[in-house]
Amino acid sequence: ATCRIANSSETFAREQLEAAIRRGARYVDIEIEAPDEHLEYIRTLAREYGCRLIVSFHDFEGTPSLDELKGIARLCRTKGADLVKIVTTARNISDAARTMRLYDLQADGALFEGAAAAERPQLVAFSMGEAGKFTRLLCLKLGAPYTYVSAGASNATASGQYTREEMER
């Protein structure tokens, strides 16, 4: 379940995420920019109900440098993420490849340096846009536990998103 503060209000987002957690959601996704007290409340409630916390970052304009992406992933971890989700906008293949490089760092243990293996969150990273479309498939091969698809072509929430039908082929 997800409910972005940017698309609603903090109160509404909290109510929606709380309802999802109490009704048995397996995952809740909260943006990295969420106020600390909001994130802490949702994290505590999620732990109480056995729900996994996704702390996510989205860049709708481009793709940060690899060092910036590493810093973002590490910040998500410090905020208590069970899963770190990083989604960038690829303007070209180099942007998409830079986002995928996070999986190499994760595999080498370098993404979350100093964290014991059991303390390292899972990673979901891919790129939006036509130049990044392939990363939505590649991320699954590189270790992401899931990717995002739309119910149909008219339901896409981001550029480059596959439909459920396309993914099932």
Q: What residue spans do the PLM features occupy?
A:
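Glycine/small-residue-rich loop that forms an oxyanion/phosphate-binding "nest" at active or ligand-binding sites
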Residues: A1-E37
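Catalytic alpha/beta core domains of metabolic enzymes, predominantly
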Residues: E33-R169
